[in-house]
């Protein structure tokens, strides 16, 4: 019984790691600010570039205020965002 439970836990851990490694990342840029969002993960990284310098600040933030896919398409149609 313990072997079965151990095997099930190991299998679940492997599946979670595979899912995390297959996350699809997308980079959105607008006016010297870029956001990299990886689906399958709960965080984004925000890159801010100061005008005239090459310093880039990166920080992680919660994606609770992230636009939905429909909103992203609307923004893409307006030409506001550049997808790399």
UniProtKB/Swiss-Prot annotation:
Statement: the UniProt record of this protein carries the keyword DNA-binding: no
Keywords, sorted A to Z: Amidation, Antibiotic, Antimicrobial, Cleavage on pair of basic residues, Cytolysis, Disulfide bond, Fungicide, Hemolysis, Immunity, Innate immunity, Pyrrolidone carboxylic acid, Secreted, Signal
GO cellular component, one term: extracellular region
Tissue distribution: In hemocytes only, but not in all hemocytes observed.
Disulphide-bridged cysteine pairs: 25-38, 29-34
Protein name: Gomesin
Major location (coarse): secreted
Function text: Active against several Gram-positive bacteria such as Bacillus spp, Staphylococcus spp and E.faecalis, several Gram-negative bacteria such as E.coli, K.pneumoniae, P.aeruginosa and Salmonella spp, filamentous fungi such as N.crassa, T.viridae and yeasts such as C.albicans. It is active against the parasite L.amazonensis as well. It shows hemolytic activity.
Modified positions (Arginine amide) in chain numbering: 41
Positions of the propeptide segment: 42-84
Localization in the cell: Secreted
Modified residues (Pyrrolidone carboxylic acid): 24
The keyword Repressor is annotated on this UniProt entry: no
Signal peptide coordinates: 1-23
GO biological process, one term: innate immune response
Organism whose genome encodes this protein: Acanthoscurria gomesiana
Domain of life of the source: Eukaryota
């Amino acid at each position: 019984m313990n072997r079965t439970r151990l095997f099930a836990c190991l299998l679940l851990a492997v599946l979670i790691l595979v899912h995390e490694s297959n996350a699809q990342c997308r980079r959105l840029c607008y006016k010297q600010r870029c956001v990299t969002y990886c689906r399958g993960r709960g965080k984004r990284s925000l890159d801010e570039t100061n005008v005239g310098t090459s310093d880039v600040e990166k920080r992680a933030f919660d994606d609770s205020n992230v636009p939905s896919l429909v909103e992203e398409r609307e923004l893409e149609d307006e030409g506001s965002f550049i997808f790399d």
